[in-house]
C-alpha cells in the first residue's frame, strides 16, 4: 500500500523517461521488460529509471504495467508464458504465486543465474518472512521486492491500552458498546482473499496450518492439536461477527470499508495494512475525520498537492502524526494465545525471471539492481511500500516515514505465509466460499467442511465454487 503518491505531472515525466530510455541503444539494444502491477506504476517506473542510470547503459530496464487486479495480473502472465512470449523478462509476482509459477516451470530458479549471484543477493539482508514466500520445495524462485503486514489500529481516546488478544478485542468492543461508544471491530470478512488472510493469521497464531509443508495434505483437522487450532480460529471469527454492537455489515467488509469505519467514528478497533495511517492523516487534513480536525491546524496548510493528495513535508508529516496520536494509535496484531505473538499473514511482491527471457544474465542483474538497498529505500520512503531489506529498519529516514517500523520488522521476522501450493487459487477460493458468511460459522462443522473442500482443491476434483 502506498503512503505517498507521485503527482500526475511527475508520473507522466517518469513514464516518458522510461520509454525514451527503453528506445535507446544501451547494451547493444538489450531491453529487459519489467512487468509490475499498474497500481504502483509510478514507483516501479521511477526505480527502473534509477537502475538505468546506475547500470551505465549496459542494458535498459523498461517497466510495463500489468492490470491492477491480482487475478488479472496472474492471467496475463500465464497467457504470455504459455504462449512463449520472449519479450517477458522480469515478473513481479504476488507472494502466493511462487509455487504455481515454479511448478509450471514459468519462473527460473535463482540458481540458474549465469553470474551465480542471485541466491546470495536474495538471501542476504532480507527479512525471513518475505524470503519464505519466494521459496518452493526449499528452492528459491524469486527475490522479494516489497512486503506488508497488518497491524492493530485503535482509538487511543476510547481505551487505556490496546487489546493484546482477540478475546481481549471482543471484550473491549463489548465494553465500548455498553458505554454507548464506537464498538465495531473493523476486519476484512467478505468472500474474497482478505477473508482468507484473516483466517490464515488466526489459524497460524493458534498453532495450526492449512497444508503440510509439501502442499499435498490438508492439516486443519488431522491431529487433535490442529483441530483445536482450527476451531479456535473459527470461534474468534464468529465472536467478532456476533459481539454486542458488532458491525451489521461485517459480511461485506474489506480493507477500504475497515479504514472508513474508523475514520467515520463507527469502529474503535481495526486490523489492516499500514496504508490506513496516511489515509487517516489525509482525510483529517481535508476535514473528513470529526475526531481529528487536522484541517484546523495552521502548520498543515499546503500539505495537500494539486490533486488533493496528502504530500506533506517531513515536518508536516511529523506534526500531523503527533496530533493523531491523541485519538489514533497502532499496536502489534492481536494474538490468539495469551503471551504469544501473532503470526501475521504477509503480503507483497517477489521478482522472478521468466523462462522465456532471452537475456537471463541481464534479467537477474536487473533484479539485483531493482532491490539494492538504495533503491529499496526509495521504494519505501517515496513509494510507501514496506522494505524487505533488514538494514533499512535501522535507517532514520525509513523510521521517520514508518513510525510503526519496530512492529513491522518484528512481525515480518515471525510472519505466517499463505498455504504454499501450485493450486493456491483453488484453495483460496474454497476457503473463502466455505467461511462466508462468517455470521453462519459453526466452528466444528466448518472445520470439517474446510478440510473436505480444500482437499478437493488439492486433488483437482470438481469445479471451484
Predicted regions and their residues:
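Conserved N-terminal structural module of periplasmic/extracytoplasmic solute-binding proteins
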Residues: 2-99, 116-119, 295, 299, ...
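Short helix-initiation/N-cap motifs at beta->coil->alpha
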Residues: 65-77, 96, 167-168, 249-263
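A structural signal for short loop-to-beta-strand junctions that line the ligand-binding cleft
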Residues: 78-80, 87-89, 119-156, 334-344, ...
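Hinge/lid segment of periplasmic solute-binding proteins
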Residues: 95-149, 161, 167-170, 317-332
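Short, solvent-exposed loop/beta-turn-alpha elements that line the ligand-binding surface or hinge
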Residues: 111-125, 189, 208-232, 282-285, ...
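Glycine-centered hinge/linker elements that transmit conformational signals in sensory
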Residues: 172-173, 216-251, 333
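Mature extracytoplasmic/periplasmic domains
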Residues: 275-278, 282-288, 292-319, 337, ...
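Conserved C-terminal helix/tail region of periplasmic/extracytoplasmic solute-binding proteins
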Residues: 390, 410-465
Amino acid at each position: 500500500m502506498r503512503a505517498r503518491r507521485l503527482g500526475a505531472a511527475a508520473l507522466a515525466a517518469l513514464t516518458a523517461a522510461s520509454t525514451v530510455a527503453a528506445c535507446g541503444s544501451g547494451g547493444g539494444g538489450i531491453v529487459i521488460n519489467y512487468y509490475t502491477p499498474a497500481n504502483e506504476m509510478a514507483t516501479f517506473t521511477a526505480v527502473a529509471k534509477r537502475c538505468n542510470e546506475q547500470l551505465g547503459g549496459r542494458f535498459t530496464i523498461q517497466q510495463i504495467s500489468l492490470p491492477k487486479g491480482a487475478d488479472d495480473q496472474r492471467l496475463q502472465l500465464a497467457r504470455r508464458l504459455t504462449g512463449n512470449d520472449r519479450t517477458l523478462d522480469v515478473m513481479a509476482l504476488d507472494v502466493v504465486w511462487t509455487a504455481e509459477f515454479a511448478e509450471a516451470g514459468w519462473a527460473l530458479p535463482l540458481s540458474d543465474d549465469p553470474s551465480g549471484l542471485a541466491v546470495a543477493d536474495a538471501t542476504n539482508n532480507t527479512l525471513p518472512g518475505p524470503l519464505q514466500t519466494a521459496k518452493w520445495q526449499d528452492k528459491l524462485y524469486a527475490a522479494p521486492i516489497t512486503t506488508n503486514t497488518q497491524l492493530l489500529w485503535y482509538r487511543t481516546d476510547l481505551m487505556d491500552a490496546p487489546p493484546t488478544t482477540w478475546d481481549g478485542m471482543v471484550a473491549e468492543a463489548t465494553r465500548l458498546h455498553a458505554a454507548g461508544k464506537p464498538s465495531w471491530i473493523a476486519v476484512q470478512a467478505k468472500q474474497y482473499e482478505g477473508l482468507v488472510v484473516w483466517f490464515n493469521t488466526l489459524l497460524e497464531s493458534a498453532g495450526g496450518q492449512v497444508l503440510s509443508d509439501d502442499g499435498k495434505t490438508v492439516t486443519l483437522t488431522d491431529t487433535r492439536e490442529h483441530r483445536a487450532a482450527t476451531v479456535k480460529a473459527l470461534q474468534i471469527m464468529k465472536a467478532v461477527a456476533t459481539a454486542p454492537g458488532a458491525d451489521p455489515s461485517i459480511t461485506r467488509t474489506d480493507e477500504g470499508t475497515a479504514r472508513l469505519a474508523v475514520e467515520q467514528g463507527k469502529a474503535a478497533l481495526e486490523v489492516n495494512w499500514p496504508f490506513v495511517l496516511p489515509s487517516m492523516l489525509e482525510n483529517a487534513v481535508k476535514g473528513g475525520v470529526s475526531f481529528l480536525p487536522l484541517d484546523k491546524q495552521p502548520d498543515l496548510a499546503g500539505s495537500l498537492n494539486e490533486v488533493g493528495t496528502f504530500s506533506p513535508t517531513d515536518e508536516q508529516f511529523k506534526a500531523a502524526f503527533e496530533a493523531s496520536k491523541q485519538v489514533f494509535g497502532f499496536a502489534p496484531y492481536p494474538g490468539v494465545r495469551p503471551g504469544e505473538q501473532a503470526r501475521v499473514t504477509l503480503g507483497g511482491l517477489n521478482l522472478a525471471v521468466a523462462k522465456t527471457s532471452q537475456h537471463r544474465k541481464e534479467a537477474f542483474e536487473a533484479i539485483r539492481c531493482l532491490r539494492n538497498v538504495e533503491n529499496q529505500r526509495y521504494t519505501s520512503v517515496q513509494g510507501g511500500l514496506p522494505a524487505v531489506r533488514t538494514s533499512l529498519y535501522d535507517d532514520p529516514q525509513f523510521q521517520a516515514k514508518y513510525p510503526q517500523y519496530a512492529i513491522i520488522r518484528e512481525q515480518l521476522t515471525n510472519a505466517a505465509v499463505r498455504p504454499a501450493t501450485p493450486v493456491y487459487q483453488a484453495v483460496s477460493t474454497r476457503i473463502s466460499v466455505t467461511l462466508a458468511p462468517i455470521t453462519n460459522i459453526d466452528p466444528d462443522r466448518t472445520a470439517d467442511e474446510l478440510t473436505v473442500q480444500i482437499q478437493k482443491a488439492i486433488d483437482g476434483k470438481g469445479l471451484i465454487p
